[in-house]
């Protein structure tokens, strides 16, 4: 390379941008969600929920596909398809007259309802969603169990027991704090009453002391007055006696 010729190596900034576009920003795959298990009674209906997350806006070409694999079977068959805004029920299988579309693509919902359940409906249902250009992702499966009478699941019973215990504990705590509040309030009222009584006694004793203080000079004055009156009376009597002696 001649001196002063421009370098042909890529710019470090361009290389970093290329690396980030290829490695740090991979295409996000669509994610599909369903229940893990659902239960239904013979002759009733059950809703198979299906929703999804996509990095793209909901496309007009969005599609939902439901497949069914019987219990113990190996092959899955298509039983429902939604595309171009229209639901299509496959004519193959026993669900063709029992499936109802209840989904709403604008809310990313592809749910269906199966009516008139039978024991033969036990199996696995698979929901597949395509939201072009986001078409890469995994499907989601839900297993249907049909019983003559839907049993109470262990999780529901356990949750009810735990909820009951927590309710009792909260009730006991509430009762404890209520009793404690009433006791403290009563103690405060009693304390205020005692304080008022003490203040009343203090004021009464103060009034009595001041009253006695005011009465003491009066008593002394009355005593001095009686003494002086008595002395004057004695002096007068003595003078009268002396005058009588002089006359004699």
Curated annotation (Swiss-Prot):
Residues 30-143 form the Ig-like V-type domain. The keyword Lipoprotein does not apply. Keywords: Cell membrane, Disulfide bond, Glycoprotein, Immunoglobulin domain, Membrane, Phosphoprotein, Signal, Transmembrane, Transmembrane helix. Residues 224-248 have a biased composition (Basic and acidic residues). One of its GO terms (cellular component) is basolateral plasma membrane. PANTHER family: MYELIN P0 RELATED, MYELIN PROTEIN P0. Residues 1-29 form the signal peptide. Residues 30-153 are extracellular. N-glycosylated; contains sulfate-substituted glycan. InterPro entries: Ig-like_dom (IPR007110), Ig-like_dom_sf (IPR036179), Ig-like_fold (IPR013783), Ig_sub (IPR003599), Ig_V-set (IPR013106), Myelin_P0-rel (IPR000920), Myelin_P0_CS (IPR019738), Myelin_P0_Ig-like (IPR047014). It is found in: Cell membrane. Belongs to the myelin P0 protein family. This is Myelin protein P0. The chain crosses the membrane at residues 154-179. It is a single-pass type I membrane protein. Found only in peripheral nervous system Schwann cells. Is an adhesion molecule necessary for normal myelination in the peripheral nervous system. It mediates adhesion between adjacent myelin wraps and ultimately drives myelin compaction. Glycans are attached at residue 122. One of its GO terms (biological process) is cell-cell junction maintenance. Homodimer and homotetramer. The lineage of its organism: Eukaryota, Metazoa, Chordata, Craniata, Vertebrata. The keyword Membrane applies. The gene is Mpz. It comes from the Eukaryota.
């Amino acid at each position: 390379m001649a001196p002063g010729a421009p370098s042909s190596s890529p710019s470090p900034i361009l290389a970093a941008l290329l690396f980030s576009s290829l490695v740090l920003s991979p295409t996000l795959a669509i994610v599909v969600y369903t229940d893990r298990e659902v239960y239904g009674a013979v002759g009733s209906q059950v809703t198979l929920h299906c929703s999804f997350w996509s990095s793209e806006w909901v496309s007009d070409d969005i599609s939902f596909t439901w497949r069914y694999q019987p219990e113990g079977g190996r092959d899955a068959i298509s039983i429902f398809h939604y595309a171009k805004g229209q639901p299509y029920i496959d004519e193959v299988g026993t669900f063709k007259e029992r499936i109802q579309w209840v989904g709403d693509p604008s809310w990313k919902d592809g749910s269906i309802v199966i009516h008139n359940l039978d024991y033969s409906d036990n199996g696995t249902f698979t929901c597949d969603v395509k939201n072009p250009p986001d078409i890469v992702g995994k499907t989601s499966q839900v297993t249907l169990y049909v019983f003559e009478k839907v049993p109470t699941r262990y999780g529901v019973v356990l949750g009810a027991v735990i909820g009951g215990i927590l309710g009792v504990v909260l009730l006991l705590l509430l009762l404890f704090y209520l009793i404690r509040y009433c006791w403290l309030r009563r103690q405060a009222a009693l304390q205020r009453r005692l304080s008022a009584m003490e203040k009343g006694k203090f004021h009464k004793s103060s009034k009595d002391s001041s009253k006695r203080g005011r009465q003491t000079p009066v008593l002394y004055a009355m005593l001095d007055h009686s003494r002086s009156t008595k002395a004057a009376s004695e002096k007068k009597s003595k003078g009268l006696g002396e005058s009588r002696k002089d006359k004699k």
